[in-house]
Structures are given as C-alpha cells and as structure tokens.
Regions:
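Intrinsically disordered, charged and Pro/Gly-enriched terminal/linker segments
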Residues: 2, 24-25, 29-30, 40-43, ...
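A structural micro-motif at secondary-structure boundaries
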Residues: 10-32
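Generic start-of-chain signal for non-secretory N-termini
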Residues: 1-7
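C-terminal flanking helix
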Residues: 72, 76-83
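Residue-level signal for inorganic ion chemistry
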Residues: 51, 75, 108
Length: 161
C-alpha cells in the first residue's frame, strides 16, 4: 500500500499538510508533540516508555501508556494511517517512516536546499504542552537549531561581502 507523503514544518511553528499541501489539523497538542518528536528523528525507533515519560511525566506508567495509545490513535486518524505506514509501531517502540514525510528541520540540518530558505523561525515556536521533560528537550533543540541558523546566516553574509 502506498501513502501520501506528508509535509511537516517544525521551524517557526507546527504545520502539517498532506502531499497536495492541504493543511491537516490535529485535535490534540500531544498528538502534535508526538509527531514532532518522532519526525525530528526520522526512522529512529523510540521506546514507548520514553515517549510516555516525555509527554506525560506527571502520570503513572500505566496511565501514561494508555494516554500514548489514545494519542497515537488520534494521530493515525488525522493522517488516515490506521495501517501504521507513516507512524510505525514495533515491539521496540514507535518511529516515523522517513519516506512518509518531508520535514523542514531535518532538511535544514542536512542542507537539502538553501538552509536560509528553510529556517522560518525557532523550532516549534510558540509550542507548549506543559510537560517539563518535553519542554527541556524543546529548549535544547531550539538552542541547537538556532545556533545552526546563526552560523548559516553568518556564512551567507560573509559570502555576500
């Protein structure tokens, strides 16, 4: 079965679109956080326990895992991915299929197109889910990608002189 290649923008905010560029709304901030976290490391399998702790640090393990299952269901419905081809489940955990998404933050880091065109602002700018461990990760990624953007813009400025 084939599936639509999704477009995910994480630089400057969170925007998700289908292959035709039509916006896809997620009914839950946690679903967006789950997708952003997995998509920022395409193909990497992340354990359910790690994700549950990241997104629901104030809940017990059983309740956090139940919340993860529910959030994954919400995400898959929005993506029309009940077969699990875009967000892949395995015994080891969850992953985003790298061929299912075009992800601006990943392309920015790979230098797939002019980085200055891709960088639209801080990583997940304005995004907040009130989960301290996720927020710590988010701050780190914002700082790292912001520094990378500054290097890119500095190099462009030096080239133009």
């Amino acid at each position: 079965m084939t599936f639509t290649k999704f477009q995910l923008r994480l630089l400057g905010g969170f925007e998700l679109a289908d292959g035709a560029g039509m916006a896809i709304a997620l009914s839950s901030k946690k679903a967006a956080a789950l997708l952003a976290y997995l998509a920022h490391r395409p193909g990497e399998v992340v354990s359910r326990a790690k994700i549950a702790t990241l997104l629901w640090p104030d809940r017990g393990e059983e309740q956090a895992r139940a919340s993860l299952r529910q959030t994954l269901s919400v995400l898959r419905k929005a993506l029309d991915d009940e077969a699990g081809e875009a967000v892949v489940s395995s015994a080891q955990g969850l992953a985003v299929a790298s061929q299912a998404f075009t992800i601006d933050s990943v392309e920015f880091e790979l230098g797939a197109e002019p980085a200055a065109d891709l960088y639209q602002g801080p990583f997940l700018d304005g995004f907040d889910i009130r989960a301290e461990i996720f927020e710590d990760w988010l701050r780190g990624e914002r700082a790292r990608l912001g520094a990378r953007a500054m290097q890119t813009f500095t190099a462009l400025l030096e080239q133009s002189q």
